[in-house]
């Protein structure tokens, strides 16, 4: 993947592969060392590409492109290999400036370079309707039924612990 520079008004940001020395920056976007470490390992093993958006070398967003087959969409792809976009995240103040779109385009470019003709993702349509609209605008369409993607523990601002059920739909795009 070739790093590229983009502009938001007068701010220049760079889309590029994340490197191990970016770990401290990533913690400003999402404070989960083990998640980032595992993703860097997957990238090192050739199973994924971890792509970030950076302003002045500070991470402002990222996405993990899993190159392993997204098995749950196989019935909808005529068994063509389908990569999986996971955990697209942009820091709140910089959302709606096109950074997410550029990360998606970078994933699509990498897939094409690797001969992968389908790209999939999961999105929670109830909790994240803006993301679903973005994916639709970029040519992704829903396949299958809504499903429980995971149950995640959280702690709210008052320190109360709870569990969140992430009900998602699969979306795919043929490249």
What are these model-derived regions, one by one?
Residues 72-76, 155-161:
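Intrinsically disordered, low-complexity Ser/Thr- and acidic-rich flexible linkers and loops
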Residues 8, 17-92, 104-105, 174:
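Acetyl-CoA-dependent GNAT
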Residues 135-145:
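Conserved acetyl-CoA-binding loop of GNAT-fold acetyltransferases
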Residues 1-8:
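Short acidic N-proximal helix/loop "leader" segments that mark the beginning
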Residues 111-123:
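Conserved GNAT acetyl-CoA-binding A-motif
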Residues 121-132, 148-153, 161-162:
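Conserved beta-strand-loop-alpha-helix junction that forms the acyl-donor binding cleft
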Residues 90, 96-109, 133-137:
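Conserved acetyl-CoA-binding loop-helix of GNAT-fold acetyltransferases
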Residues 48, 164-171:
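Short hydrophobic/aromatic beta-strand or adjacent loop that forms the aromatic wall/cage
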């Amino acid at each position: 993947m070739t790093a590229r520079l983009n502009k938001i008004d007068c701010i220049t940001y760079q889309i590029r592969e994340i490197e191990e020395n970016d770990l401290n920056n990533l913690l400003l976007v999402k404070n989960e060392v083990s998640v980032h470490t595992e993703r860097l390992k997957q990238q090192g093993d050739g199973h994924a590409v971890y792509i970030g958006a950076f302003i002045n070398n500070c991470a402002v967003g990222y996405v993990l492109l899993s190159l392993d087959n997204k098995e749950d969409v196989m019935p909808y792809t005529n068994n063509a290999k389908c990569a999986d976009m996971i955990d697209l995240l942009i820091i709140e103040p910089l959302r709606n400036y096109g950074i997410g779109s550029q990360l998606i385009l970078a994933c699509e470019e990498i897939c094409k370079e690797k001969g992968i003709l389908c790209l999939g993702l999961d999105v929670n349509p109830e909790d994240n309707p803006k993301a679903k609209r973005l994916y639709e605008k970029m040519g992704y369409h829903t396949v299958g039924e809504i499903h429980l993607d995971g149950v995640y523990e959280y702690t709210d601002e008052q320190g109360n612990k709870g569990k969140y059920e992430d009900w998602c739909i699969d979306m795919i795009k043929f490249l």
